[in-house]
């Protein structure tokens, strides 16, 4: 079941690029291919670089063919790769037997780290900063020596021979874009790492392979047959994936350029999510079976886990950024219809906005709230179950009690809640019960979520308690199948956790708690994430953890609970979910998922006919069960209507104190007196009125020189002056005044809050803040020529907190300080003091709008221009924006909100109403109310009689 209303992403892997053409910029730019050439070559693939250059993408071949096919041209890099592979094979033969296992384990781990960490780092910096292309440009690798600008003509000639030998058609290195040439060089590095990774793994498996003692022929034959089948399946997955995505996505081509064609995906991409990283590693476990070695199995699991980390950290962020960018923010004029009725409705809604909606999610450890009754009760009951399981003896009586308890909770979770949901679907029984007592539908929904969450928690906790009672710690882990059962069992538990996480991410809180049983669903059915491949993932892999725990305990009662749980899950899907889904969505329901389609399409005709016959028998027999369940449901449902029922800490981490000396050789000839730095920003309104008559934290001593006070989050413009011969790698950093004890050497890192004095001197996107550099400046000293520059600190380069800050000008990419700005303060204007005239939502909106715009970087695609305009989609995707806003609200209005409130409200008007509602609730406890009366009871303490 998938009732999520979000757009389907359809992007599950870097090898799975479904919308490449739509992602290519159509901006006017220099093109290396004319329209006439395109028409003359209609079957060619065209690529487009980030600057808009269009070029023909030549045909290339996979690395195995390039290396081992004698018909393919060979070059020096092929010889190098083959020589390194031969060295691996020689080592497996020549090393002493006692050293083969540890050495080849280290060799494989080295190449796996080169893959996941090395390639991962290169791809990350290329995705974020285009760093590989910058390196190639800076080193002038592809600069034609005829121009006289290439310092290494021999390297250019070598690269030209290497690359052009591999691609005889449609490719000339001198004519190809820089991005494409860089990608080709990157490919050769990838070829080396991947081939060595695979060969070293196979050699490690060979040196670990052995025949277990007393292994029978049947077990050995089954082990080899299954192992060979898994390796063959793995080979087919790789070949079919390469057939679909070609070399472009195989080698992460879209980190460098985009292709101008629609990509079609079928075959293996219909079977499983991330097929290259999920089922594409089945061969590892097949080889482990053939080797009959736990060492190979464990190193396979480690490598597989590292590959999933690579997917999550490197590929998925790039996919989201490239193929699924946030949609543009809706403007106010596009949100309001031109019809009078819509306009009137809009005016009414703005005058009397509805009560702010709750955004307190329940699922997940990060949503745990000890002050919420459901979470509090869950912790107490889980603690009770754990205590009982630990303190009671594991006698047959107690074991039986725990098993029965687990079965009862499983029955309640599947049958009891299933009956309630069925009655809710047919007659809104649960909602009507609360309406009868004057509650609302929203209250019924909250109570249902609590009941379901608590029931699910106790169902699984009671099952784990029963497993604990039935489990016997192995006396010998090497005996029989003990270790294998634990490994497979833990893997099945991990599979169920991943399945549940994928389901929750796809459905959200609304779908997880069956929200369409309680409210009319306005969204369309979407099939994304795990639902792209399976209609009901709970049917097969949703209970894998039950069978995993049964394997680990190897207990017949636990196997019985797992069987009951699986059967009840199938029944819940068939008799609770499916009828409701058919009633709500009707013909919009998908009949076959991606995996089912692929399997049916792959079956031979005789098997297809047999499958149709089996389906007919199943449908005929199903009517009997339906009639039986209808009768049972009526009886079980009788009387069911009477059933009732962040903290955070901020740590600033600093490295050890630097030991840089102020007297550094490269400082010779530079006088700090010739450097200066100043700044301008948006001043805080009324910031100069600091001195008051109050004995409070607001009281300040007036002085002649006023400290500059800037708005929270407003951009700060920095101007610097330096000698004309200053280092090209000078830079300016932003620090809190209290962070550095020394005025000569900076002791703490900037954490990204810095901008270089000149562009193109560093490899990252820090150049974005540069406005001007090395402009002639008025010289205060006749003997020294001065230059000046300007830069802007905004967005992530600011400290999103209140405090006193300073800018520091540093010399030559080091931490030697040449100039320090005057201290300045960043502060939020408090609007909850007794002398601040904030009387209603309109005043709150007026105070909040400019701060929210600052928090959203004043970006037109994110920040609203008016209180009615919606926030950009970036606010939902990146929590940093919401954290900035709630910090500002907390210090401006004295009301603390969770970050999830900001994207849930979506505009300033709703946020203002939420603030007013919260302040109204908290008004009796507000300190400002008490400040209106004298702080000391003078009359009582000093009577007039005295």
Swiss-Prot record:
EC number, UniProt record: 2.1.1.17
Reaction catalysis annotation: a 1,2-diacyl-sn-glycero-3-phosphoethanolamine + S-adenosyl-L-methionine = a 1,2-diacyl-sn-glycero-3-phospho-N-methylethanolamine + S-adenosyl-L-homocysteine + H(+)
Key words of the record: Endoplasmic reticulum, Lipid biosynthesis, Lipid metabolism, Membrane, Methyltransferase, Phospholipid biosynthesis, Phospholipid metabolism, S-adenosyl-L-methionine, Transferase, Transmembrane, Transmembrane helix
Biased composition (Basic and acidic residues): 33-42
A GO cellular-component term linked to this record: endoplasmic reticulum membrane
The keyword Nuclease is assigned to this record: no
Gene Ontology MF: a single term: phosphatidylethanolamine N-methyltransferase activity
Residue ranges of the region described as Disordered: 1-51, 322-355
Organism superkingdom: Eukaryota
Entry's localization field: Endoplasmic reticulum membrane
Function field: Catalyzes the first step of the methylation pathway of phosphatidylcholine biosynthesis, the SAM-dependent methylation of phosphatidylethanolamine (PE) to phosphatidylmonomethylethanolamine (PMME).
Protein name as it appears in the record: Phosphatidylethanolamine N-methyltransferase
Organism expressing this protein natively: Chaetomium globosum (strain ATCC 6205 / CBS 148.51 / DSM 1962 / NBRC 6347 / NRRL 1970)
């Amino acid at each position: 079941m998938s009732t999520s209303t979000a757009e389907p992403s359809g992007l599950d892997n870097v090898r799975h690029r479904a919308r490449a053409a739509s992602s290519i910029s159509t901006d006017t730019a220099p093109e290396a291919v004319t329209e006439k050439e395109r028409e003359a070559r209609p079957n060619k693939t065209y690529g487009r670089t980030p600057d808009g250059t269009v070029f023909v993408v030549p045909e290339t071949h996979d690395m195995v063919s390039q290396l081992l096919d004698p018909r393919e041209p060979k070059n020096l890099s092929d010889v190098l790769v083959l020589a390194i592979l031969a060295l691996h094979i020689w080592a497996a033969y020549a090393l002493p037997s006692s050293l083969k296992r540890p050495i080849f384990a280290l060799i494989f781990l080295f190449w796996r780290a080169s893959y996941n960490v090395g390639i991962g780092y290169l791809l990350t910096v290329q995705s974020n900063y285009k760093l590989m292309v910058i390196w190639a440009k800076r080193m002038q690798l592809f600069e034609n020596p005829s121009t006289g600008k290439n310092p290494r003509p021999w390297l250019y000639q070598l690269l030209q021979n290497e690359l052009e030998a591999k691609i005889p058609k449609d490719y000339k290195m001198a004519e190809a874009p820089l991005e494409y040439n860089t990608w080709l060089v990157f490919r050769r590095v990838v070829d080396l790492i991947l081939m060595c990774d695979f060969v070293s793994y196979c050699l490690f498996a060979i040196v670990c392979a052995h025949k277990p003692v007393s292994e029978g022929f049947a077990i050995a034959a089954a082990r080899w047959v299954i192992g060979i089948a898994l390796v063959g399946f793995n080979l087919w997955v790789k070949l079919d994936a390469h057939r679909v995505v070609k070399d472009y996505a195989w080698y992460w081509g879209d980190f460098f350029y985009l292709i101008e064609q629609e990509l079609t995906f079928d075959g293996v991409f219909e079977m499983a999510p991330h097929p290259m990283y999920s089922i594409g590693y089945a061969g590892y476990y097949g080889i482990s079976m053939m080797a009959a070695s736990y060492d190979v199995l464990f190193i396979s699991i480690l490598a597989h886990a590292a590959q999933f980390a690579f997917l999550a950290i490197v590929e998925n962020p790039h996919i989201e950024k490239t193929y699924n960018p946030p949609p543009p923010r809706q403007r106010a004029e596009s949100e309001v219809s031109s019809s009078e009725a819509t306009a009137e409705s809009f005016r009414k809604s703005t005058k009397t906005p509805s009560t702010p909606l709750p955004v307190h999610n329940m699922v997940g450890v990060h949503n745990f709230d000890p002050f919420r009754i459901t979470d509090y009760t869950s912790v107490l009951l889980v603690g009770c179950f754990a205590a009982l399981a630990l303190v009671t003896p594991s006698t047959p009586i107690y074991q039986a009690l725990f098993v029965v308890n687990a079965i009862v909770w499983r029955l309640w979770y599947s049958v009891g809640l299933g009956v309630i949901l069925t009655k809710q679907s047919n007659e809104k029984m649960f909602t009507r019960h609360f309406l009868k007592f004057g509650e609302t539908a929203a209250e019924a929904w909250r109570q249902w979520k609590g009941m379901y969450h608590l029931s699910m928690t106790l169902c699984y906790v009671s099952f784990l308690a029963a497993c604990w009672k039935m489990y016997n710690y192995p006396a010998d882990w090497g005996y029989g199948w003990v270790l294998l059962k634990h490994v497979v069992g833990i893997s099945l538990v991990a599979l169920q956790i991943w399945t549940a996480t994928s389901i929750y991410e796809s459905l959200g809180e609304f779908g997880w708690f069956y929200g369409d049983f309680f409210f009319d669903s306005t969204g369309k059915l979407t099939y994304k994430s795990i639902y792209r491949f399976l209609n009901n993932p709970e049917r097969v892999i949703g209970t894998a953890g039950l069978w995993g725990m049964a394997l680990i305990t190897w207990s017949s009662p636990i196997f019985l609970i797992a069987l009951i749980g699986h059967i009840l899950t199938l029944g819940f899907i068939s008799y609770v979910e499916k009828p409701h889904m058919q009633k709500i969505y009707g013909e919009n329901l998908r009949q076959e998922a991606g995996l089912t389609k692929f399997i049916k399409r792959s079956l031979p005709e005789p098997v297809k006919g047999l499958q149709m016959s089996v389906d007919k028998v199943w449908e005929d027999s199903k009517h009997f069960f339906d009639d039986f369940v209808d009768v049972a449901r009526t009886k079980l449902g009788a009387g069911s209507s009477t059933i009732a029922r962040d903290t955070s800490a901020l740590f600033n981490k600093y490295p050890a104190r630097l030991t840089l000396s102020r007297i550094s050789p490269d400082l010779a000839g530079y006088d700090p007196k010739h450097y200066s730095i100043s700044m301008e920003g948006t001043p805080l309104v009324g910031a100069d009125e600091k001195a008051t008559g109050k004995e409070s934290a607001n009281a300040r001593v007036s002085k002649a020189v006023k400290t500059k006070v800037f708005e929270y989050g407003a951009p700060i413009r920095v101007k610097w002056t330096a000698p004309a011969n200053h280092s090209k790698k000078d830079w300016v950093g932003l620090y809190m005044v209290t962070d550095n004890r020394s005025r000569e050497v900076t002791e703490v890192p900037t954490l990204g809050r810095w901008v270089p004095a000149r562009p193109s001197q560093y490899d990252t996107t820090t150049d974005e803040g540069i406005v001007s550099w090395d402009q002639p400046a008025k010289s205060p000293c006749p003997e020294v020529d001065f230059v000046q520059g300007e830069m802007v600190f905004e967005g992530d380069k600011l400290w999103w907190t209140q405090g006193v800050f300073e800018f520091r000008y540093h010399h030559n990419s080091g931490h030697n300080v040449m100039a320090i700005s005057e201290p300045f303060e960043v502060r939020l204007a408090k609007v909850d003091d007794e002398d601040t005239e904030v009387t209603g939502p309109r005043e709150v909106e007026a105070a909040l709008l400019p701060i929210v715009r600052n928090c959203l970087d004043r970006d037109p695609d994110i920040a609203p221009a008016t209180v009615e305009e919606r926030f950009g989609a970036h606010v939902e995707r990146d929590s940093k924006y919401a954290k900035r806003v709630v910090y500002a609200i907390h210090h401006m209005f004295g009301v603390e909100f969770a970050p999830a409130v900001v994207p849930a409200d979506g505009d300033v008007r709703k946020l203002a109403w939420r603030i007013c509602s919260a302040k109204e609730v908290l008004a009796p406890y507000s300190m400002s109310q008490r400040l209106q009366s004298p702080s000391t009871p003078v009359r009582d303490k000093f009577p007039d009689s005295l």
